[in-house]
Every structure is written in structure tokens, then in C-alpha cells.
Design a protein with these regions (language model features):
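Generic recognition of long tandem-repeat/solenoid scaffolds
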Residues: 41-44, 219-221, 251-253
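C-terminal hydrophobic structural anchor segments
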Residues: 199-240
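Acidic/polar, low-complexity extended loops/arms that serve as protein-protein interfaces
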Residues: 1-168, 184, 195-200, 206-208, ...
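A glycine-rich beta-turn/hairpin centered on an aromatic-Pro dipeptide
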Residues: 174-199
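Structural recognition of the beta-strand scaffold that forms the well-ordered cores
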Residues: 82, 173-174
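Protruding loop/beta-arch "assembly-hinge" segments enriched in small, turn-prone residues
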Residues: 51, 56-58, 114, 239-271
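Hydrophobic, well-ordered secondary-structure elements that form the walls
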Residues: 176, 207, 251
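Short intrinsically disordered coil segments
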Residues: 56-61, 96-99, 188-190, 223-224, ...
Length: 271
């Protein structure tokens, strides 16, 4: 029996990476503010001043716009991985193992940020995602898992009725993989017509897909009105000391970010 002298050949260069949700919001052209420190307040006029025509010789009326603010406050998240001495010895290449872990932690942070931007609860240190922003437009579908084309298009009208101008560069639909598949087979005007989602677009607006979106939900928004506040950069620290008595090396990844919207009415979420 020769099995005792057959060794495993570990091919870390051919590592099969974990499957993670697609990143969406950062590809939707949001407004990104970098190098932030502490709480950041962005002044906002809501509602603005109002003008009106008057007859000759009549004084115009006073208008009192309301000044509000949009606030960003640091939300920190991260993870760590412990690499055992045995693993590093068995691979014979601690650098490759460390790089593998660094890359996975980086992807993990990106996934966490995307989840926060879409469905973050705003509680317990979490940022507030689009689905939970107070004041966004909401739309109810007759059949939650199978909206009609008219219902999907009606989301545009809800946003535009609030004086928001949608455009093909910064306005996107975002939905789940399952809903996206449904939209590809949802006829616009009955049998024989074209479909709601064709070639990655709905009525000229790009469609992004993410498993971070809540089941049966469709989001439409002008993402230039979505603000991503970045506090510093992603920090990855190699700590050989905390578990030095066992020869274990700890890799820690941390990053701080927050999200806000200029105008909640720039978004519509199906409920």
C-alpha cells in the first residue's frame, strides 16, 4: 500500500475563491466623499424659496426656505482571520497564504459595505441603506414576485413627480437575481411583445443585480444623489504577537464608511 507516501500537492495559486454577492452601488455612479473625519454635515435647503408673478406695482411676497442638513457619521466594520503555524509550515509559502487571506478580507469588506448601502438597518452601528431611508418613494405591486411592466414604469413617475430628473447615466434599477430573471420574461404588452428587461435595461435605464437586495424588491434611483462617505482607507494589519505563543498569525481588516442621500425622493423602493 503506497498511500502513506503520497503527499497532497497544495496549489494556492489555483485557489477557488468563495462566492460573494455582486457589488452594485459603487458601480451606480454615486457621489463619493473621501478623507472624512468625524461627523460631517452637508447643508440642504428643503423646501426652497418660492417665487410668483405679481401685477405691476405689487410687492413680491416673502419666501422662507428651510435649511436642513445631511449628516455622515463614521461606521466601522471589519473581520480577522487567524493563520496557524501548521498551515504556514505545510504550505511552505507563508506569503501566498497571507495574500490569499488579505484578498478574501478585502472582498469581505466590499460585500459588507454593499449590504449596508442597500439594506443597512441604521441600528447597532450599521449604516442606513436605501431600503430603510425615511422618505423614499414606495410602490406596491399587485403580485410582489411578478410585477407588471406598467408597475415597474410607474416607479419612474413617482420619482419624477417630486421634481427629480432621472437620466441614463446616474439612474439605475437594482433588484435581486430572481426578480431580474422574472423581468426578462415579463411581457410589456401581452403575449408576443418585447420584455420588461432586455439587454440589461428597463425603458432605457440600466439594471444592476445584487443578492444584497431584499427578496422581491426593486429599487429605482438617481444614484448621484446617494452619498458614500469614506473615512480613511481600508486598513489591513498583520499581527504576529497576540497569539505568538502558538505561532499563529492574525490578519485584521478594518474600514470606516457611511451612507446618506441628498434627497430621499430621488429613490423608489417596492414594498
Amino acid at each position: 500500500n503506497s498511500s502513506a507516501i503520497v503527499f497532497d500537492d497544495l496549489r494556492y495559486s489555483s485557489l477557488i475563491e468563495s462566492l460573494r454577492p455582486f457589488s452594485t452601488v459603487l458601480s451606480a455612479n454615486p457621489t463619493i466623499l473621501t478623507g472624512l473625519n468625524g461627523n460631517v454635515s452637508i447643508p440642504k435647503i428643503n423646501p426652497g424659496s418660492t417665487s410668483a408673478f405679481v401685477t405691476e406695482g405689487t410687492a413680491v411676497s416673502q419666501s422662507d426656505p428651510t435649511l436642513e442638513s445631511v449628516t455622515l457619521s463614521q461606521k466601522t466594520g471589519g473581520a480577522y482571520v487567524d493563520i496557524s503555524r501548521t498551515l504556514m509550515m505545510n504550505t511552505g509559502d507563508s506569503f501566498s497564504v497571507e495574500n490569499m487571506v488579505r484578498n478574501d478580507l478585502s472582498r469581505s469588506l466590499a460585500t459588507m459595505f454593499d449590504a449596508g448601502s442597500v439594506s443597512g438597518s441604521g441600528a447597532g452601528g450599521n449604516p442606513t441603506g436605501i431600503e430603510n431611508v425615511t422618505g423614499v418613494n414606495t410602490s406596491s405591486f399587485t403580485s410582489a414576485g411578478a410585477p407588471s411592466y406598467a408597475e415597474i414604469i410607474a416607479m419612474q413617475g413617482l420619482i419624477e413627480s417630486d421634481n427629480v430628473s432621472l437620466d441614463g447615466d446616474t439612474s439605475f434599477y437594482i433588484t435581486t437575481p430572481a426578480m431580474n430573471s422574472t423581468l426578462k420574461t415579463t411581457a410589456k404588452n401581452g403575449a408576443g411583445s418585447s420584455f420588461a428587461q432586455e439587454d440589461g435595461f428597463i425603458d432605457g435605464y440600466p439594471v444592476l443585480v445584487s443578492s444584497q437586495v431584499t427578496s422581491n424588491t426593486i429599487i429605482l434611483g438617481k444614484f448621484s444623489d446617494f452619498i458614500v462617505g469614506v473615512y480613511g482607507g481600508m486598513e489591513i494589519t498583520v499581527d504576529p504577537y497576540s497569539l505568538s505563543t502558538t505561532g499563529t498569525q492574525r490578519i485584521v481588516a478594518l474600514a470606516s464608511i457611511d451612507f446618506a442621500v441628498r434627497h430621499p425622493v430621488s429613490f423608489c423602493v417596492s414594498v
